Structure formats: structure tokens, C-alpha cells
Amino acid sequence: GKNTWRKEAYPYYKANRKAGRDKSGMDWNALFQIMNNVRSEIKEFFPYKVIHLDHCEADDIIGAVIHEHGSELNIGSEKFLILSADKDFIQLQKYANVDQYDPIRKRWIRHDQPAQYLEEHILKGDTGDGVPNILSPDNCLAVGERQKAMTKKRLALYSEGTQNMDEETLRRFYRNKMMIDLSEIPQKYQDQIRAEYNEEKNIGREHLFNYFIQKKLKHLITDIQDF
């Protein structure tokens, strides 16, 4: 949804994305409108749960659902497949019933130490999302400044715990933890997401045929059983 809670908490979140869109020359408003229409039609006609909430991103929805339904033991638990190349989701692989597949490169994304990966991700930041490492000021990526280097020695020191951080580094650590750790989603949004997810959806497949006819999707009609 628009106006994400991360942007409200940290104004530099994804700050360079808009600049990149402005330079591209693409009509992004038209593209977003098309995406919104497609999402609405999937919600109306397809037998799938579609969750879309203002102030939340897809990461929030996936994170909140999996933190509720994730299981340490892979025994009789509902299985979850995250279809995304985004390595932010590696942290959710701490649950035995969670797997991740990259549909672009057609490969599994798996990590033996998801908790350690998350810890290092927080310390190093996420440049793609405009989140610097914990040694660098909030605005450094937005204004194009170099980050202070996170050397292996510093990484090892800070991995031992927050007791090794001064006050400003500690503040930046919690800044990054809020942006990156999917267990840090504000409770009110977690509750909204889970309520939507757990709501029964009674749309069967009977609407699909008419939808495909209406949209002239003849090539999909022959594969309707796959939906």
C-alpha cells in the first residue's frame, strides 16, 4: 500500500527509488494503475487470497503471516513457499515449513544460518532500500555520500552484541532493525494482516471461465485446471 509505515518512521527509506523513476521516462502512474486493476481482478475472480493494506508492503504481509504460522518443526505444519528473489526473506527460513524460490533465475534460495544472515543484514544495511550500515548517518545514501566501511573486524565486534556499540551506533542499529527485521512490523499492522489472511474466502473456480472469455484469454482456458 501507499505511504508505508517504514517511510513514515525513516524518511530516507527507498529515497532513491523515486529519483530513478523520474529519470526513466516511463509513465509510472499508468503502470501502477494497471497493477492495481490486475490485483483487484485477481481478488474478485480468482480463488486466491489477495491482501493489500495501506501503509504495508508485500514484505510485511509475508512476514506477518509466516511469523504467525511458521513452525520450528516441519511436522504436520502448513508449508509456505515464498516466490521471490528478494534475499530479505532469508530470515524467515528459520522456520522449517518455509522455503523460497527465485522465479526469475529458476533456483531455490536457501541459507543454513538465517538468524546470522539477518544479524549481518542489519549491521550492513540494505543499500537497495536506502538503509545504510550502522556506522553511517541516516541520509548518506540519499545524498550520495560514501558509507563508513563495515570491515570484517567491526562486523565481528558488533556481532558479539549491542554492548560494543556507542550511543549513536546503537540508535542506527535499531533504525536498521526496524527497517529490515520482519518481526519488527508494528503490532497494529500485524493484526490487520493476520485478520485479512485468516478471513475465509469463498470464491471458487466457477468465475474463472467467464473471466477468461470476457478478457479474451483463450490460451488460458485450455489450462484452467492449473488455476
Indicate where each model-derived feature is located.
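Extended two-metal-dependent nuclease catalytic cores across DNA- and RNA-processing enzymes
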Residues: 18-222
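Non-catalytic, usually N-terminal nucleic-acid engagement modules in DNA/RNA processing proteins
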Residues: 1-10
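C-terminal catalytic or substrate-handling cores of phosphate/nucleotide-
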Residues: 13-16
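Short, amphipathic C-terminal "tail helix"
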Residues: 225-227
